[in-house]
């Protein structure tokens, strides 16, 4: 859907639903007994010195609902400054709609466990990342100069575990990127910074950090390197 309610203002909306059958994903951790280990060895798996395993499976069906809203406004001031502003909003929610029964071989091997447990069902296959994202971008140009800003808000998200007591919810976060350009003939000189407020994700709790091996969630929508500043030179033919 595209609307132009005012001069220089454009609004677009995209609503979608995506259904996936037999989605490929990793199974939960399956505890292996001696029968299962011998079966793996007899089918080409090398020396096995572990007690659990995961494998890729088509055990689930998923459904994703979402909406993308974008509004863009353009304006030129009397002094020659041109302004371009874009506001965007995204909502995205995924859920598991069906989990297939275990294959017979697992029962035969005595590995009759939940192939897709709570962690995979709600988290890895569901809402591991924020459901809500809001962005505001502004570009100002005047003569050879241009100023760019992009402000993004990521909504909260939850890292799910097999046991609900170990779940961890991460708060919403704002990030700001800034850049300035100067154009001279075919040359463009840029100075900028990403995440200029030096925002870091919240640290994982003791359970999710795997004994301290991981400080931050690998599903954070933004990185854990803090602020990043740069300069670049471009030449346009």
Regions flagged by a language model, labelled:
Residues 166-168, 179-182:
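Hydrophobic alpha-helical bundle architecture
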Residues 14-161, 232-236:
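Gram-negative outer-membrane beta-barrel transporters
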Residues 7, 65, 77-81, 143-144, ...:
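Short coil turns and loop connectors of transmembrane beta-barrels in diderm outer membranes
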Residues 131-135, 173-177, 228:
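Transmembrane beta-barrel architecture of outer membranes
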Residues 2-21, 192:
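Structural signature of Gram-negative outer-membrane beta-barrels, strongest in the C-terminal barrel
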Residues 57-62, 166-170, 220:
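Outer-membrane beta-barrel proteins
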Residues 2, 70, 179-181:
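Residues within well-ordered beta-strands of beta-sheet-rich folds
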Residues 93, 150-160, 181-237:
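C-terminal beta-signal and adjacent terminal beta-strands/loops
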């Amino acid at each position: 859907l595209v609307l132009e309610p005012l001069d220089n203002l454009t609004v677009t909306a995209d609503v979608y639903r995506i259904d996936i059958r037999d989605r490929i994903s990793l199974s939960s951790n399956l505890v292996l007994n001696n029968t299962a280990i011998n079966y793996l060895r007899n089918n080409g798996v090398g020396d096995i010195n572990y007690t659990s395993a995961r494998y890729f499976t088509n055990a689930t069906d998923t459904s994703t609902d979402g909406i993308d809203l974008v509004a863009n406004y353009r304006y030129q001031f009397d002094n020659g400054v041109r302004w371009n502003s874009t506001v965007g909003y995204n909502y995205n929610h995924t859920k598991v709609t069906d989990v297939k029964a275990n294959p017979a071989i697992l029962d035969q091997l005595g590995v009759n466990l939940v192939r897709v447990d709570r962690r995979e069902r709600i988290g890895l296959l569901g809402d591991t990342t924020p459901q809500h994202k809001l962005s505001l971008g502004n570009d100002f140009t005047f003569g050879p100069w241009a100023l760019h800003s992009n402000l993004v808000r990521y909504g909260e998200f939850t890292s799910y575990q097999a046991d609900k007591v170990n779940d961890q919810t991460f708060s919403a976060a704002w990030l700001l990127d800034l850049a300035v350009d100067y154009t001279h003939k075919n040359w463009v000189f840029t100075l900028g910074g990403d995440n200029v407020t030096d925002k870091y994700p919240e640290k994982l709790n003791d359970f999710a950090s795997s004994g301290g091996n991981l400080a931050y969630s690998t599903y954070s929508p933004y990185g854990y390197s803090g602020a990043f500043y740069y300069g670049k030179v471009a030449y346009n033919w």
